């Protein structure tokens, strides 16, 4: 079974991962695709793959049931495994690269309740931190935009700047938590009290890429709801919530590139698209069924 399929930044390469413990790389040309590489290194099903931004080279992360996060890099047509991270004690469910402005940084969410953050440094070395996030396991992670809301034009960061390193996690404790990088300690710290309201596992979280007036986070849950959390720059610690009801558990949420349309999918075999109207209410603008 194929668990994930992700195109690279330019849409020219497709990475897939499977229960057969492999990752496959395909070259995409028009309507055709050609298998160019099969990467082996995991000891169990591979749940997810994720491409880094091309400014850091052709770098791919993979994670799976074996609790490992593997980093792969292609140079001169050859793929090599350049880093193994194996401190998690259970399945790593998802990996997510930060916005490229914040560095080459990967957040990893695991069923052991921990989140790890791996950073690729200028000297080709890797640094990592790992911390406890959700008592019953972490199912999802999503980075905030590198630019704070309301500041469409920002000054160019210094070479040593870490940007706006914040992300949200969703867990089997039914909660969302927002984490922010503390440059003084070099650690990620809980930014505020957890966002609560879901009555079952949070399966997915997605932080909208918009840098307009508000921050938006969507969360999908086994409780048959999607919650859309909003925060105003004037009071960034205050998050308000709108609830969207569904007929089945909701597994995935994803924002459009502009951050104003939300796609949700789940156990009802539908993909629904949602948009905020002028009154601040969320409306289903399209439903796609199998």
Curated annotation (Swiss-Prot):
GO molecular function: structural molecule activity
InterPro entries, alphabetized: G-protein_beta_WD-40_rep, Sec13/Seh1_fam, WD40/YVTN_repeat-like_dom_sf, WD40_repeat_dom_sf, WD40_rpt
GO terms for biological process, alphabetical: COPII-coated vesicle budding; ERAD pathway; mRNA transport; nuclear pore localization; positive regulation of DNA-templated transcription; positive regulation of ER to Golgi vesicle-mediated transport; positive regulation of protein exit from endoplasmic reticulum; positive regulation of TORC1 signaling
Membrane topology (UniProt): Peripheral membrane protein
Source superkingdom: Eukaryota
WD repeat placement: 1-36, 41-82, 87-128, 133-189, 197-239, 245-284
Cellular component annotations (GO), alphabetically ordered: COPII vesicle coat; endoplasmic reticulum membrane; GATOR2 complex; nuclear pore outer ring
Primary localisation category: membrane
Gene3D superfamilies in the cross-refs: YVTN repeat-like/Quinoprotein amine dehydrogenase
SUPFAM superfamilies documented for this protein: WD40 repeat-like
Pfam family, one: WD40
Subcellular localization: Cytoplasmic vesicle, COPII-coated vesicle membrane; Endoplasmic reticulum membrane; Nucleus, Nuclear pore complex
Keyword terms of this UniProt record: Cytoplasmic vesicle, Endoplasmic reticulum, ER-Golgi transport, Membrane, mRNA transport, Nuclear pore complex, Nucleus, Protein transport, Repeat, Translocation, Transport, WD repeat
Role according to the record: Component of the coat protein complex II (COPII) which promotes the formation of transport vesicles from the endoplasmic reticulum (ER). The coat has two main functions, the physical deformation of the endoplasmic reticulum membrane into vesicles and the selection of cargo molecules. It also functions as a component of the nuclear pore complex (NPC). NPC components, collectively referred to as nucleoporins (NUPs), can play the role of both NPC structural components and of docking or interaction partners for transiently associated nuclear transport factors.
Family to which this protein belongs: Belongs to the WD repeat SEC13 family.
Quaternary data: The COPII coat is composed of at least 5 proteins: the SEC23/24 complex, the SEC13/31 complex, and the protein SAR1. Component of the nuclear pore complex (NPC). NPC constitutes the exclusive means of nucleocytoplasmic transport. NPCs allow the passive diffusion of ions and small molecules and the active, nuclear transport receptor-mediated bidirectional transport of macromolecules such as proteins, RNAs, ribonucleoparticles (RNPs), and ribosomal subunits across the nuclear envelope. Due to its 8-fold rotational symmetry, all subunits are present with 8 copies or multiples thereof.
Protein name: Protein transport protein SEC13
